[in-house]
Amino acid sequence: MLLLNQKREFYLTILSFFFTLSVSAQQAVVYGTVTDFQTGEPLVGVLIKADKTNARTVTNNEGFYRLVLSGRQRVQLNFQCIGYKEHTQSVTLQDSLRCDVQLTSAEQVLKEVTVTAHSEMRKLKEAAMPVSVIGQQQLQGTASNMNDVLARTVGVTVRNTGGMGSASRISVRGLEGKRMGMFVDETPLSQLNNFIALNDIPTNMIERIEVYKGIVPYKFGGSALGGAVNVVTKEYPPVYLDFAYEAGSFNTHQFSTVFKRTNRKSGLQFGIGGTFSFSKNNYEMTLANLDNRTVKRDHDLFNKVIGGMSVKATKWWFDEIKWELVFMKTYQEIQGIDLDIREAYNRSVNYVTELSLKRNNFFLDGLDFNFDINYVFGKYGMHDKAMNRYDWDGNKLPPVSAYGGEQNNFPSDGNNRLNELISKLNLQYTIDMHHSVNFNAYFDHNSLHPKDTLMDKALGFRSNFPSKMNTLTLGLSYDLTLFNGRFQNAFTLKNFIFSSDSRSINVFSVTEPERVKVFKSYFGFSNAARYKFTPDLMLKASFNAEVRIPSSEELIGNGYSILASPALKPERTKGVNVGMLYRHLKADNGLIEVELNTFYNLLEDMIRFTPDMIPTMARYRNFGSVRTQGIELEAKGDVCPVLYLYANGTFQDLRDVRKLTPGTVVENPTYKMRIPNVPYLLGNFGAEFHKENIFGGSGQNTRLLFDASYIHQYFYDFEVSRYQERKIPTSFTMDAAVEHSFGNDKWTLTLKVKNLTNRRVVSELNRPLPGRYIGFKVRYLLR
């Protein structure tokens, strides 16, 4: 069993130091947001220039801008954006001054303007590819965690194996696991799956979630095939306090808090926060492998603590310098299915630290610099030393090994050590409003030192060895926009380089491990385009031929249950996406959106997790070729000022296209059969009623929410017969919530019910999932 394989990648980070130059004490900072006058939505890529100076900047993805000016004089700020009327604002400089601006749409676009930062080009790049964006409203309500939110997104499937802390896999259009890029604020999460999962990030701390399909934006770095999930955390005002606590069924408790404070004079922002998650996961489950016997889970406790601090400077030579330090500790019991496991557990402790540097106009007007360097240190291991095993009747059974062990055939007392250094450099040069180039370099050094003397003693030989892995991904991109922004195109060329140094055990002679060194280099490319026929209707198309470098776990193992696979080939893919998007702003400022996408993908040298001949061990192997094709449709909008509706559906067909059994000339018996354990038909729909001051008074808001999810039955083995019983039944679940805030969102109370009808739901190899969950959440917000 993979150690904490439910832990997915999250945000990684570092240790390093950097000296910087401070600016004159006479400098002042003007900052704020730029929004659309009609919709209130943030505007990306608005050019802001200070009159009679060379100072200029553009708004970021949240419509936020920051401008450093000298002196204490009165200046004119000029705001320009394609499709909007030019706006001029007069301000008197102070140490720190907020200036929020609303722009009015213009019938004629502005003439060509030189943009000197990468935000506008980032907007163009993201607009050209298929992407779903999940905002703050969807992050609250019935959702208790990020997986709940992602599961309602068109084309996305989240498969869990249990309750809180259980293993889960996120797939986009059928491609899942390590093929999906996982990012936090555009930073790849790399090897943190042993320590933390995206699902561990509290929804209160998230501004939005971006789900990219098919193509991963070049500025993210790293290698991914099926798409990417990017979690964008919140930008906080000068003073901010957020406290949330939720209690629910199965003895579940979740707590999170964030405190931020900014010194206006120095421009330093200090932050501290943390989360605490606890659940016994003691729900009843029906065991299909034991004649549908019902038992109560009694060894599935999960406990995780995360604490962090940060310091950010905004008045030094760099526009932004940020240092973060995070600590994580996890304890998780292992729940038995076939047998009643009573003692085995996983544990991990991890430290991550990061230094990030940002500077617009980096020694050259129009050149923007963004650099991150991170360091990760962690220890983890599975502990399974029980001298007895038990069946579900309480009968005592002897262990398979004389040294004990109940989870596997051999015991384990792992104490594995991981060291990782990650850095990412992004340089964006904007030539003019039509042309931009980007260079991205992502480097990852991973060093694993496994140790499990008890397992080695029981096996009679050493099964895992220290290993190292280096990866370097280089990307060069060109962005083009024409016809007053109606046509956008982004072309990216990437070079994937990796090397590893590990030892491989010959299954026929386990006493002589062989040292294996690997060095390989591959190229890939992608292109995405978008054309607007009208302000409301656009066509998107993209093509990619890319490579995914095997992760360190796949290539060099994990130190206790996964062996090294130095001969593993990278996965390669060729894919096409074509879609139409209709987005209409109603007279009452309500928004209607309808999007249709079709997609085709051919994945070669697919990597799969398979058992090994060595007892208790497994390794990753190349499976062959898989073809994916499908269609997805989503419609959502404001029916009236108080009612919002959404619905989406996905059909994804994954087929085995290997004509021959690997390594033989024998015909493949599963040729053109559907890939097992992957849902192929799914849909979601929901509604939200919202109204202010429904009970009288002022500063109050009430939301009633309903969500439903449908997944058609599918097989968890190849469908060789229509009567085959190895299938996961159709599931239809409903969630509901009531949310009421008062004091202008200072206090928010939420009552939520998940799986309203208490329907029996199974997933991932027929594993039973929790039944009805009832939770109550209170949140306090000071800003």
Residue ranges of each PLM-predicted region?
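Short, acidic, small-residue-rich periplasmic hinge/interaction motif at the N-terminus
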Residues: 35, 39, 49, 80-84, ...
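Extracytoplasmic beta-strand/coil segments of soluble accessory domains associated
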Residues: 131, 142, 147-188
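Gram-negative outer-membrane beta-barrel transporters
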Residues: 593-602, 621-715
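Short acidic/polar hinge/loop motifs at secondary-structure boundaries
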Residues: 66-68, 187-213
